[in-house]
């Protein structure tokens, strides 16, 4: 899972 700057981006990466 790639983690970006922002919770929204993290959430999208998890999905």
Curated annotation (Swiss-Prot):
Domain of life: Bacteria
Record keywords: Ribonucleoprotein, Ribosomal protein
GO cellular component: ribonucleoprotein complex; ribosome
Family: Belongs to the bacterial ribosomal protein bS21 family.
This protein's name: Small ribosomal subunit protein bS21
Organism name: Brevundimonas diminuta (Pseudomonas diminuta)
């Amino acid at each position: 899972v790639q983690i970006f700057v922002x919770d929204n981006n993290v959430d999208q990466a998890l999905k």
